[in-house]
A protein has these predicted regions:
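Aromatic-lined carbohydrate-binding/catalytic grooves of carbohydrate-active enzymes
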Residues: 71-216
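Glycan-recognition surfaces
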Residues: 242-345, 366, 379
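Carbohydrate-binding surface patches
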Residues: 327, 333-336, 341-343, 379-418
């Protein structure tokens, strides 16, 4: 949640044994060694992105049982529940105090009458009886975001200093047991302001009303974030969730707003992970939040999704007077496999917006079981084309006009990785109109509009699939980044928490140089020794990719050092493993040398691993390309 707060590191007496154990394990293990294991997060219940409603955008801390049950009832009555919207999430503002001396959390009975006899169980029972699930909010630190930035908010926790410490810090097992075993919640959002905003120099701490907690997160500086400490606390949270939910029926939301390089590691610690600061109901904030996730297609998978924040449809630039923008917002979030969490006051939301939330054809793209986030097939400042491969073999394409002038965009078979000489059918998922073309067509896109289509055609790769078509099955277990750097491609909005004070928003979300589909880590076209590759994976040297194989029998690629590399000296060796066994290995390859064809029989292997190894250089100066990397259904070479 709110992320204009400053974090550094937290006292770690309780974490030291865990950190030492983790460090010892890491030191004893070569991160490039094959594991025959899919390492991205698969616990909990998020094989498809979660859908539902959250209280924050509409109400902030001014929440009560009537408002939340009103939203739940509208979700059921409107048919949205039947379409997959099932989580009803209470955000910040519910906690009254931490009772002393037993440290048990108490809700606000004046706002939530059903809690008057000791807790939320009657509330969650009612939601469950409606066929819905219930979510609750907490923070990594002692205190929450509203306490850090809420001013004189009357809805803040009450009582002594200790009673007002309603965050998880020091109470992880107790609180999670309370939330899940005793109160019956299903969804857990964990914010990070409590480990960011309460340093000794904080005005809040200086008042004497809050205890100091040395920060471990800094939104503006990944270098000042203590990433191992944050990861250690999320590990403890995961362990507690598993103990309290032996059936695995939970969903964990990481909300550290893209800070601390979480865009790289969040996929290993939770079901959804925020890639940016909070969204706001302004067009420029949509662009910022979109950009924080749109080039992270290899970092979102079934069970661990990128989260550019909640839908803000229903307010500002996305209200009922801005249906073009509202439809774009919904279409883009669906293509990104973002959680579809509405944030409007659904009791008064116009039917036109309910109809947007309820577009079943677009929901189907978001909930497609293949779990492939859309990949940028065309990437420019004013127009983008995003393509998603579906489990059925169909495609989806979104043509997004970011700007203020209409565009007649060229959509080609190459964008879609379909044959140029065969008919291609487009079904507009808003108008439901069908069109057919061969090779290429024009798509008229109004300002701020997203034209979104389901696509049927003949695959360019008839007997297989390019790895870049199935990012949901490709995990950069080790992406080669050694020094996380802020990503300069994220749009810098003027509508941040400080408005136009200061010098403007600067790049802040680490992830620059991460693995990419159909692109180098730094946004260049894939190319080895002058030969371009329209399909492939770009990643840094000293990296390891995990690939879920399915029933494919062969893998092929052309490998080499990408032409964009600044390191013209050091060699890279490429290896293919199947279930931990070395299947193929290249000769050492340097910049300027032609690509080497590398292939292997992977029939029967569940996990294929692609390793690019080098010594002596700087990974960030040595991007490599797995050109045309594809899984094939035939054991014969293409």
């Amino acid at each position: 949640m709110q992320a204009q707060r400053t974090l550094r590191r937290l006292p770690r007496l309780a974490l030291i044994p865990l950190l030492f154990a983790t460090a010892a394990t890491h030191a004893a293990t070569d991160p490039l060694a094959p594991t025959a294991h899919w390492s991205a997060y698969t616990a909990g219940r998020a094989t498809t992105p979660p859908m539902g409603w959250s209280s924050w955008n509409a109400f902030g801390t001014n929440i009560d049982e009537e408002k939340i049950m009103g939203a739940a009832q509208r979700i059921v009555d409107s048919g949205l529940a039947a379409k997959g919207y099932r989580y009803i999430n209470i955000d910040d503002g519910w906690a009254l105090r931490r009772h002393q001396p037993d440290n048990r959390l108490e809700a606000r009975p004046d706002r939530f009458p059903s809690t008057v006899n000791g807790g939320f169980r009657p509330f969650t029972d009612k939601l469950h009886a409606m066929g819905l699930k219930a979510g609750i909010y907490s923070d990594l630190g002692r205190n929450t975001c509203s306490q850090a930035y809420g001013g004189d908010d009357p809805n803040l926790p009450k009582g002594s200093m200790l009673e007002r410490e309603v965050g998880l810090y020091g109470h992880i097992d107790q609180d999670i047991t309370l939330f899940f075993r005793d109160w019956g919640f299903d969804f857990f959002k964990v914010d990070g302001c409590g480990v960011r905003a309460y340093g000794a120099d904080s005005p809040k701490v200086k008042t004497g009303n809050y205890r100091a907690l040395k920060p471990v997160l800094d939104l503006e500086s990944v270098a000042r974030s203590d990433i191992p400490a944050v990861q250690a606390e999320f590990t403890q949270i995961n362990d507690a969730l598993k103990r309290s939910n032996p059936d695995g029926d939970f969903l964990l939301s990481l909300c550290v707003w893209g800070a601390g390089d979480v865009r790289a590691w969040g996929k290993n610690f939770g079901n959804i992970s925020r890639t940016s600061d909070d969204i706001r109901p302004q067009w420029s904030r949509l662009l910022s939040n979109l950009d924080s996730a749109v080039r992270r297609e290899l970092y979102g998978h079934p069970g661990s999704w990128n989260d550019p924040d909640m839908l803000f449809i229903g307010a500002g630039d996305f209200d009922a007077n801005h249906l073009v923008e509202a439809k774009s917002h919904f279409s883009l979030w669906a293509m990104l496999n973002s959680p579809l969490m509405t944030g409007a006051d659904l009791r008064t939301t116009p039917q036109a917006l309910i109809d947007i939330f309820g577009n079943a054809d677009i929901i189907a793209l978001n909930q497609d079981p293949a779990g492939n986030q859309a990949v940028l097939a065309y990437d420019a400042d004013d127009l983008e084309i995003l393509v998603k491969t579906l489990a059925s073999g169909d495609k989806a394409v979104a043509v997004f006009n970011r700007g203020f002038a209409a565009v007649d965009a060229d959509l080609t078979a190459d964008h879609l990785k379909l044959r140029k000489d065969a008919p291609i059918k487009l079904t507009d998922l808003w108008s439901k109109a069908d069109t057919t073309f061969t090779n290429e067509t024009k798509v008229h896109v109004a300002p701020r509009e997203t034209r979104i289509f389901r696509v049927q055609g003949t695959r360019a790769l008839a007997q297989g699939v390019y790895l870049s078509e199935q990012p949901g099955s490709v995990n950069p277990a080790v992406d080669g980044v050694t020094t996380p750097q802020a990503d300069p491609t994220v749009f810098r909005s003027s509508f941040g928490w400080t408005g136009t004070k200061g010098g403007g928003e600067r790049p802040m979300y680490a992830g620059w140089g991460g693995a990419r589909a159909d692109s180098t880590p730094y946004g260049q076209l894939l190319q080895i020794a002058g030969t371009p590759y329209a399909a492939g994976i770009g990643i840094l040297a000293n990296s390891r990719l995990e690939v879920r194989n399915g029933d494919y029998r062969r893998i092929e690629a052309h490998v080499g050092v990408d032409d964009s590399a600044r390191d013209r000296t050091h060699a890279v060796t490429f290896m293919i493993y199947g279930d931990g066994k070395l299947l193929a290995k290249s000769k050492p390859l340097r910049w300027g040398q032609p690509a080497q064809a590398l292939s292997a029989d992977v029939g029967g292997a569940k996990i294929v691993e692609l390793v690019a190894k080098s010594t002596g250089g700087v990974n960030e100066q040595l991007p490599v390309t797995w050109g045309g990397a594809a899984l094939l259904s035939s054991a014969q070479a293409r």
